[in-house]
Amino acid sequence: LVLFLGLVSLSICEEEKRETEEEENDQEEDDKSEEKRFLSLLPSIVSGAVSLAKKLG
């Protein structure tokens, strides 16, 4: 559970960093691709959390 929360926190920090860079560059196409990339990471994070929860069960 701690690992899962750490991964979520790290993902949120990385996403905020990406958003800041995108605003500075003001490139709309880059914004869309970064959002898709972040969303594509969510299934892995959830899968890892479920696996960890089963082990700790």
Curated annotation (Swiss-Prot):
<keyword id="KW-0964">Secreted</keyword>
<dbReference type="GO" id="GO:0042742">
    <property type="term" value="P:defense response to bacterium"/>
</dbReference>
<feature type="signal peptide">
    <location>
        <begin position="1"/>
        <end position="13"/>
    </location>
</feature>
<feature type="compositionally biased region" description="Acidic residues">
    <location>
        <begin position="21"/>
        <end position="32"/>
    </location>
</feature>
<feature type="propeptide">
    <location>
        <begin position="14"/>
        <end position="35"/>
    </location>
</feature>
<protein>
    <recommendedName>
        <fullName>Phylloseptin-Az4</fullName>
    </recommendedName>
</protein>
<comment type="function">
    <text>Has antibacterial activity against the Gram-positive bacterium M.luteus ATCC 49732 (MIC=1.3 uM). Does not inhibit the growth of the fungus C.albicans.</text>
</comment>
<keyword id="KW-0929">Antimicrobial</keyword>
<keyword id="KW-0165">Cleavage on pair of basic residues</keyword>
<dbReference type="Pfam" id="PF03032">
    <property type="entry name" value="FSAP_sig_propep"/>
</dbReference>
<dbReference type="InterPro" id="IPR004275">
    <property type="entry name" value="Frog_antimicrobial_propeptide"/>
</dbReference>
<keyword id="KW-0044">Antibiotic</keyword>
<dbReference type="GO" id="GO:0005576">
    <property type="term" value="C:extracellular region"/>
</dbReference>
<feature type="region of interest" description="Disordered">
    <location>
        <begin position="16"/>
        <end position="35"/>
    </location>
</feature>
<feature type="modified residue" description="Leucine amide">
    <location>
        <position position="56"/>
    </location>
</feature>
<keyword id="KW-0027">Amidation</keyword>
<keyword id="KW-0878">Amphibian defense peptide</keyword>
<comment type="similarity">
    <text>Belongs to the frog skin active peptide (FSAP) family. Phylloseptin subfamily.</text>
</comment>
<keyword id="KW-0732">Signal</keyword>
